[in-house]
Amino acid sequence: DMPSRNYDIIAGNLRRATGTLGNFEVTIDALQQLDPTGHGTHEWSISRQGGQSHCDIILDLRGGTPLFPAHEKRDGYLWVDASHAPSVAKAILKASHMVGTFEKTLFVKTEPSLCAHSRAQKSACSNCLDICPTGAITSAGDFVQIDPAICAGCGACAALCPSGSITYEADPSSTTLRRIQALMDGYNKVAGDHPQPRLLVHDAHGRDMIAMAARFGDGLVANMLPIEIEAISSFGHAEALGALASGFGDVHILLSPTADQVAIGREVALA
């Protein structure tokens, strides 16, 4: 039996791509398709510009600049160095598992009436537009809109929003502030002669680091109180100042490898 051919073979230059897992749209220049009909050697079709197609997953082996900003946060897009065979094998395996039905977490909530992006066609605040690493936020007249399919949930937009128009659903600011106050109240009840407490903010990656420090070393000092949040970038100047107002002597942020250091740096400077 002849093997089945349930895929197309094309050649061209991938110019751009939009979308996310399950809904990518790609634009290809110098597009040629292999014609499997006829006798003898297969021939390529006539080249054309601006060819468009849809796909569920993109495995990018071109090298050079990725198609998306913060490409590691774009679901369904796998960019690897084609010269490194183990990385290619790992990416192929990962792509092969992207089958089935997936749920996308809605990380943030917006309240357009509070948005200070623009009024009467006069541009104002663009904090979230400037800081979003994935390009999920776009201008929509007087307001901004967030594409939930592209949003990676870093939380930087909520931390930088001056009006409260964007709130981070996993760790709302009000919840984080209550947790900080509860830590402070608990410490005061048992502190005795211990020095002023210090707050250590971390995520799941930091939790593992703290656990290893306790297992293989001395762990945290007695007056260092850890608090875990979903996304480090969602911890902004308001939360930091709230911690200081509660009685903490200082606030330390334990960065993870994927943390947005630019957004965090802006909030630290503001605080």
Can you say where each PLM-predicted feature lies in the sequence?
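Short secondary-structure boundary/capping segments
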Residues: R74-G76, M184, R215-G217, R266-L270
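Short, solvent-exposed coil/turn elements at secondary-structure transition points
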Residues: N13-R15, F143, P172, I232
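C-terminal, active-site-flanking charged/polar segments
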Residues: G236, G242-I253, T258-A271
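Alpha-helix N-cap/helix-initiation motif
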Residues: Q121, I150, I232-S233, D260
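Hydrophobic/aromatic ligand-binding patch that stacks against planar heteroaromatic rings
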Residues: Q49-G51, L160, G242
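Ferredoxin-type iron-sulfur electron-transfer modules and their immediate structural context
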Residues: D1-I131, G135, Q196-I210, L225-I227, ...
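Flanking helices and flexible, charged tails adjoining ferredoxin-like Fe-S electron-transfer domains
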Residues: D1, A91, S113, G153-E239, ...
